[in-house]
């Protein structure tokens, strides 16, 4: 079972390097890792389990956050309309995106960052990604709003980018041009 002690924190080399492409079909170990990552997210969102094991709630996690430099991400959350996004993916890649941007009005957080980081993180308002799922099937997703932000955050992790790298250092609350907030 993955716990917070398994999650590496900012400054760890795996968080600043591009992760390796995962071979498909997935190995038994890669499938198990994906399942474990998914279970961590579910556990972190269950109040009783999270309290028992001192887990911070998360909606996404990437293998580099576990010190594993592979292009593997897991997502588990419901959007504002109650649609469940729950999946483990390998080799996710943004293949197209909008010019329009968006940002979370409350800012972003990260399981690998133990401190509050203030500022807006500009993201594409809409993205299309291609990936492979845990069953070795190709996946193509068109995302907008909060789901698009979550996926971009996790894809950044496999590319060695932390969310705070995208914040305007001179004016952290600068509203990016051509953007709209997401509550």
From Swiss-Prot:
Q: Which organism is it from?
A: Oceanobacillus iheyensis (strain DSM 14371 / CIP 107618 / JCM 11309 / KCTC 3954 / HTE831)
Q: Specify the superkingdom.
A: Bacteria
What is this protein for, i.e. what is its function? Removes the formyl group from the N-terminal Met of newly synthesized proteins. Requires at least a dipeptide for an efficient rate of reaction. N-terminal L-methionine is a prerequisite for activity but the enzyme has broad specificity at other positions.
The identity of this protein, by name, is Peptide deformylase
- InterPro entries for the chain: Peptide_deformylase, Peptide_deformylase_sf
Catalyzed reaction equations:
N-terminal N-formyl-L-methionyl-[peptide] + H2O = N-terminal L-methionyl-[peptide] + formate
E.C. numbers: 3.5.1.88
* Protein family: Belongs to the polypeptide deformylase family.
User: Which cofactor(s) are needed, names only?
Assistant: Fe(2+)
The positions flagged as active site in the entry are: 154
Residue ranges spanning the membrane: these are: none
